[in-house]
């Protein structure tokens, strides 16, 4: 079922001749040293180790061995694109075993991933990049990553769970999805985590995401209320683990202001605004719905940091995707806007709940104190920053790029020169030079905000009209023009 979204070779050095005696000595050392060299764990040896230790039972281990063997057999029959995908999935499984990362709770996700890929690449149609599917009757969402095969898409899975919660008539599907997800969770960072088991953007499996885990917190907490089952609160509470532990196990990056929750556990220095914001939304949902003090503390530490970080992600004309990094593409600009709206709404509701009730003619006068036996709630954070930033990001979608040309006082014919301009936000920019109605130069490129320089070499003297047109990612167009005076070419010395 389609779920719908989302060369050089190394240098070969010269080989120098080795004296025979030295070569024989080296070979003998290698022969005698070989038995003592420790071999890396393999899938089969790791499964046997876990079975011998009683950590997995015989039938379970046999099932994993069968899945692995079937995948290896299928790989031998495949060629080209299909072979590349299944080989990559097998390589990830092998690397997980070799790294000593086979633990009982991780294996269900590892081997169901291998099983799904073996079946797909043996017979199913070639997918397109980013395609998402579910394998009925399962509710788990999978995504195709070229070069990594089919992988569990936890963000998509929990996004689907939240969508089922909103429908209100598909509680059975919601329960099935949450139960499936929990069956595939891994023990990590002192709790459970929903791991990604493939290589992505420099990260090696298994890694976790504050964005996906935060979305999972929302789904589990909402499910606990809707389905009237506190086991989902218990699961969400256990899923807080990665927010309390730094990489590589968790996503916590402690700061002077509080805590940043990373989008990728393998990228400690990369702060991504949309993932951080959504992690906070999930923590807030759990803390509020479960009335959980630890969840509330984690949210508060993160919100304090986002309050410091967020202004730097607003360029005044568009959003930045990450720090360090460039501007967001159109999709991520909208995603960040929407996540900020969600945080704005949550904090606005918090303030409304804390507002004093309207005065009643029958109520006794307030003494201004706190009732005995109760604890005064901490004031809700001011939502204005998040509400206002979301609104500015919405306005950005209909605001044309601003351009300013800084033309040189003069150019000279047949000599290299430059024209400088400033652009307010990422856009596709076309620079055109016109002489007497004829286009003599035109270049187009996608450029980010800031100052840019265009090289130009006029062939003739006279006025030259330079036009710059920018179309932003939302389709808004801005333009600027300037006339540049081109002087005659410099005269050559008679001695030349």
Please place each PLM-identified region on the residue numbering.
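Long, well-ordered core segments of solenoidal/helical folds
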Residues: 117-150, 171-193, 233-255, 293-318, ...
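Carbohydrate-binding/catalytic loop surfaces
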Residues: 129-148, 191-209, 253-274, 314-335, ...
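Glycine-centered tight-turn motifs at strand-turn-strand junctions
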Residues: 439-462
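Structural helix-adjacent loops and short alpha-helical linkers that scaffold large soluble proteins
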Residues: 40, 55-65, 72-84, 94-106, ...
């Amino acid at each position: 079922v389609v779920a719908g979204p989302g060369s050089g070779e190394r240098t070969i050095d010269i080989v120098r001749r080795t004296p025979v005696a030295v070569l024989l000595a080296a070979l003998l050392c290698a022969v005698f040293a070989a038995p003592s060299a420790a071999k890396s764990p393999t899938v089969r040896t790791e499964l046997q180790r876990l079975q011998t230790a009683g950590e997995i039972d015989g039938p379970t281990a046999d099932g994993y061995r069968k899945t692995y063997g079937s995948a290896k057999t299928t790989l031998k029959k495949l060629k080209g694109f299909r072979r590349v995908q299944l080989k990559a999935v097998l390589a990830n499984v092998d690397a997980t075993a070799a790294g000593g990362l086979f633990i009982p709770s991780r294996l269900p996700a590892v081997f169901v991933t291998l099983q799904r890929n073996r079946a797909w690449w043996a017979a199913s149609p070639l997918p397109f990049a980013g395609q998402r599917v579910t394998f009925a009757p399962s509710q788990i969402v999978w995504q195709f990553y070229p070069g990594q095969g089919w992988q569990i898409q936890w963000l998509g899975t929990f996004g689907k769970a939240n969508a089922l919660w909103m429908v209100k008539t598909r509680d059975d599907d919601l329960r099935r999805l949450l139960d499936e997800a929990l069956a595939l969770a891994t023990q990590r960072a002192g709790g459970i985590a929903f791991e990604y088991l493939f290589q992505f953007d420099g990260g090696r499996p298994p890694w976790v995401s504050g964005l996906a885990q935060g979305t999972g917190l929302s789904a589990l907490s909402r499910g606990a209320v809707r389905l009237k089952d506190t086991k989902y609160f218990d699961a969400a509470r256990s899923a807080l683990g990665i927010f309390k532990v730094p990489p590589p196990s968790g996503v916590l990056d402690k700061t002077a202001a509080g805590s940043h929750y990373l989008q990728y556990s393998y990228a400690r220095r990369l702060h991504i605004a949309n993932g951080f914001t959504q992690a906070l939304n999930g923590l807030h949902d759990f803390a509020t719905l479960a009335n959980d003090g630890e969840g509330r503390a984690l949210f508060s530490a993160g919100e304090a940091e986002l309050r410091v970080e967020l202004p730097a992600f607003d360029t005044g004309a568009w959003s930045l995707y990450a720090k360090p990094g460039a501007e967001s593409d159109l999709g991520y600009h909208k995603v960040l806007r929407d996540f900020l709206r969600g945080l704005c709404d949550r904090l606005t509701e918090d303030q409304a709940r804390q507002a004093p009730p309207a005065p009643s003619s029958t109520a006794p006068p307030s003494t201004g104190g706190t009732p005995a036996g109760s604890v005064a709630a901490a004031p809700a954070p001011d939502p204005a920053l998040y509400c206002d930033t979301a609104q500015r990001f919405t306005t950005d979608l209909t605001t044309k790029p601003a351009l300013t040309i800084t033309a040189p006082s003069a150019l000279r014919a047949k000599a290299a020169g430059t024209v400088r301009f400033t652009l307010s936000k990422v856009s596709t920019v076309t620079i055109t030079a016109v002489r007497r109605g004829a286009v003599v130069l035109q270049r187009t490129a996608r450029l980010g905000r800031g100052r840019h320089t265009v090289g130009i070499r006029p062939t003739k003297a006279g006025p030259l009209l330079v036009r710059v047109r920018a179309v932003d990612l939302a389709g808004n167009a801005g333009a600027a023009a300037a006339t540049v005076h081109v002087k005659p070419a410099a005269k050559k010395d008679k001695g030349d």
